[in-house]
Amino acid sequence: VALCIGLSVYAATALADDPFRPEAGKFPPLEKAHSYRGELVFVDHANRRGSLRVEGTGKFYRNDPHPFAMLPYGIVRYHGAPADLRDIPLGTLMHVRAFLPPDPKTSVVPVLPVDSKSKDAGHYRGTGIFPAENHVLLLEDEPSHCLREGLVWKLREVEIHNGEGTITATRAPAQGDAPKAVEDMMTFDSATRIWRGSERIGVARMVADAAWPASGKKKLGGQPVQLGITWKPAPGDGLGGAFTRFHISDIWLDEAAIEQAAQFQTETHKAFIRGRWMPAWVDAVEYGKFGRATVTATLFGGMDASLYADFQKGVQAQMNGAENTLKHAGGHYGPGHIASNGRITAITQADGKIPLGSSGIQIQFETDLIIEGIRPTRVIRVRPQSWPSRQVPREEYVNDSLEERFPTPAIFPKY
């Protein structure tokens, strides 16, 4: 008996110590994700992967690009709106919530030791720059992060010489203040975009309006704004000065300005999803006779509400197999050529808290000819017939090769 109890305790302890990995068919809890941020330096948009220069404890410019992959239900946000990786300019500072690879054997990016984030990378790079948690649930730029968290940047002081300089600011709750907020000093220059309402202005206009001095310093009194943040190499030999100093690409001076930016990005993403179809995964399949089937699927989250509104009971639709990269399974004559045709017979909205990655919307789809790729836990794409039937470019669908279905991590340099 004592031996059995001992083995049970050991097994329970071992299970508790096992690192968390997302499972197929389940949306992982956001609170179990590892958080970090870094500069976007490479994008393979067709395979939903790329590299970030992750901020650690050392000199930022020395940090090697760190590969990441989006989970199939992973969400990208830019300017406070849904986005695709192709929408994000290189150099943008991104906030990340990520997990260990769900299945290391099929990871499209290099798999690292679980404790990588705690190891000192050496060469003045410090710790934290190579997290093993490189499968991303949420990837968002600075204004998206602040809007989601209810934060703003409060400008404290500007210093300007010859049209460029630095801004000192604190990130704090939009309502109230953060007594222990740490001041950040960031650079700007004449290329920094400044948005006021629907108008784009620049540094020269801020000087002309006497909002900023022509030269020297000025206190700004905690003016609340949203900032777009990037990174650019700083002057000097890298032996001294600030280890990490970020650069301001955009300043949104008021709510109208950031709302307009979000609206433009929303329209860009809506057009993209209508052309590529809504991603989802299969919860269950009930097979009938002679190829007939009823498919229950959950639509992925993070899209504009108007896209979900197009999924209505009784509408005709198409459903196609897809990979974890969201690539269509075949598309020589368009993804609709081999997709299952049918209609949506039921729509269910989940109650309670919806996990990030899920829309909470479940559809039932009846077809008289189900294709191979539509199986439980598999990723699919689905299109209401009201959406346009379009071709997709060659890099966005798979053919017969294993390399296209399971992209290798070998494209990433070993620094």
Label for each model-derived stretch:
Residues 9-73, 78-415:
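Short, flexible, surface-exposed loop segments at domain boundaries
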Residues 1-10:
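Bacterial N-terminal signal peptides
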